[in-house]
């Protein structure tokens, strides 16, 4: 067992579900970057399993001080790479290395609500690595939550809404700018999003993905996804509230986008704001704020 009692850490405010801490927190062995990479290669399978069981794993003590160090550690785990260029993320981000990019370049006053990464698209990663290069003097924590726990509580507190989400799925709509908009949390241009240079190429990609679309007079592009699932079967008896419902309904707001038009059920019917508030309140209840320290690494299972 790699993660024995000597490796385990206690983090203030840590949650516990079914006798398992969330997140699991461990201390990596001390050493140089090469030794950290060797450690990562040795624990890759167990760390992935732990992230699935616990939801997330916080690792402290790795010798990571730069995006390049982070890239080296991530490469050592040898998980499949899911690059920013390959994604359909609507967030504007900066690539530092082929595997490392910023979480979001929106101004700090923009609220980014809890969500599963890229679940508003048909293409999404199974895991996410986060790294803290410099800890904030104040604030700066990253909230994460167990969506399997959220789903169980939503079914208890609002079964009709939970049933509708499960049966109908969701569709998302947003307007992509013709040029990058760094003032928005969703300011990635349609050219960057779809890796194209022309409208014709964008339309071909959209058609292949099953999207509908409408060009705006100013060159922006309004798109609507095909029906996407709101709930994911985790294959071990658990299900998770796997979507971007809360983030889209409450947070997809900028000069182009109105949250009220950002999401519907799969059949086109509107969501009841009161139902979304219940889901959001539960998410906040089960959320844990990662108290970053410089050099911390976190592995989050995007499905859980």
Protein language model annotation of sequence segments:
Residues 47-57, 78-81:
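Acidic, aromatic-enriched beta-alpha/helix-loop junctions
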Residues 61, 302-303:
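Conserved "cap/hinge" positions at secondary-structure junctions
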Residues 1-39, 46, 52-53, 108-113, ...:
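Active-site environment of non-heme Fe oxygenases that use a 2-His-1-carboxylate facial triad
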